[in-house]
Amino acid sequence: MAFTLTIPRFSAISRKPITCSSSRTQCPAPFTHGRSISLRRRLTLLPLKASTDQSGQVGGEEVDSKILPYCSINKNEKRTIGEMEQEFLQAMQSFYYEGKAIMSNEEFDNLKEELMWEGSSVVMLSSDEQRFLEASMAYVSGNPILSDEEYDKLKMKLKMDGSEIVCEGPRCSLRSKKVYSDLAIDYFKMFLLNVPATVVALGLFFFLDDITGFEITYLLELPEPFSFIFTWFAAVPAIVYLALSLTKLILKDFLILKGPCPNCGTENVSFFGTILSIPNDSNTNNVKCSGCGTEMVYDSGSRLITLPEGGKA
């Protein structure tokens, strides 16, 4: 059965019909003024409740079985990369030095996978670099695992290997009352030093090809795999060897170090080595900062930048 119901709006009577499809529901008419107001309030409250439920459903935390335990959609609970790296190092330190496992193998693998996914360099460190970080954390916590001599020796070894985790910014020493910062190898500029010799080696290679009647070009155009073998196992190694030999003939035992100025932080570069017959036996170079003009001393032995005596920081 269907009934037609007319709902009045306050004192005025609305003429928009509402159909009741329930056969058991009685829709009495006419309504009084008080009943019409009560019914209208109920009708207006229902959509608000539905919208609240929908907003709560949308704002809730999503659940995805593919998300690792260390990656949560909730920003308030998601840990930073630094916190995960610290927990990773603590787990390794506890396992190797204390003989205790603070997490299961599955949790450790999930943490390592998450750090690799985030692009963290901690999980890609060498054994010496991981040992250095563990020793630093253990010293801060009050339980050193290395003596001062072993720690300094390990740090110097990592500096000589070109590790970036031991490079720090400008800082002040309370003991020596000096301001200093660390030096790092500038691999890009050292690579650029080989470019002129490489150009000369390529010129000699094509000159040799020309005077032999393009016999080298004929070998490069041989069918596969002979062309590939000749190119990558004969021609390219010969060019690289010739370029390195020419560079070492002009520059002997060269090293390019870079580091921030202790005064203004501007990065400066210094060259160490012998150019032709001009030797440079000293391990220190006096460098003037290109930013603030501060006089600095670059030490290739300790890989440190210090200010000379009487220098102002």
Swiss-Prot record:
<keyword id="KW-0472">Membrane</keyword>
<dbReference type="InterPro" id="IPR039987">
    <property type="entry name" value="PGRL1"/>
</dbReference>
<comment type="subunit">
    <text>Homodimer and heterodimer with PGR5. Interacts with PGR5, FD2, psaD1, LFNR1 and LFNR2. Also interacts with petC and a Fe-containing cofactor (FCC).</text>
</comment>
<keyword id="KW-0809">Transit peptide</keyword>
<feature type="topological domain" description="Stromal">
    <location>
        <begin position="50"/>
        <end position="187"/>
    </location>
</feature>
<dbReference type="GO" id="GO:0009773">
    <property type="term" value="P:photosynthetic electron transport in photosystem I"/>
</dbReference>
<keyword id="KW-0150">Chloroplast</keyword>
<protein>
    <recommendedName>
        <fullName>PGR5-like protein 1B, chloroplastic</fullName>
    </recommendedName>
</protein>
<feature type="topological domain" description="Stromal">
    <location>
        <begin position="247"/>
        <end position="313"/>
    </location>
</feature>
<comment type="function">
    <text>Ferredoxin-plastoquinone reductase involved in cyclic electron flow (CEF) around photosystem I. The homodimer is probably not involved in CEF.</text>
</comment>
<feature type="transmembrane region" description="Helical; Name=1">
    <location>
        <begin position="188"/>
        <end position="208"/>
    </location>
</feature>
<feature type="disulfide bond" description="In monomeric form">
    <location>
        <begin position="71"/>
        <end position="172"/>
    </location>
</feature>
<keyword id="KW-0007">Acetylation</keyword>
<dbReference type="GO" id="GO:0009535">
    <property type="term" value="C:chloroplast thylakoid membrane"/>
</dbReference>
<keyword id="KW-1133">Transmembrane helix</keyword>
<dbReference type="GO" id="GO:0005829">
    <property type="term" value="C:cytosol"/>
</dbReference>
<feature type="transmembrane region" description="Helical; Name=2">
    <location>
        <begin position="226"/>
        <end position="246"/>
    </location>
</feature>
<keyword id="KW-0813">Transport</keyword>
<keyword id="KW-1015">Disulfide bond</keyword>
<keyword id="KW-0812">Transmembrane</keyword>
<keyword id="KW-0249">Electron transport</keyword>
<comment type="similarity">
    <text>Belongs to the PGR5 family.</text>
</comment>
<feature type="transit peptide" description="Chloroplast">
    <location>
        <begin position="1"/>
        <end position="49"/>
    </location>
</feature>
<dbReference type="GO" id="GO:0016730">
    <property type="term" value="F:oxidoreductase activity, acting on iron-sulfur proteins as donors"/>
</dbReference>
<keyword id="KW-0934">Plastid</keyword>
<feature type="modified residue" description="N-acetylalanine">
    <location>
        <position position="50"/>
    </location>
</feature>
<keyword id="KW-0793">Thylakoid</keyword>
<feature type="topological domain" description="Lumenal, thylakoid">
    <location>
        <begin position="209"/>
        <end position="225"/>
    </location>
</feature>
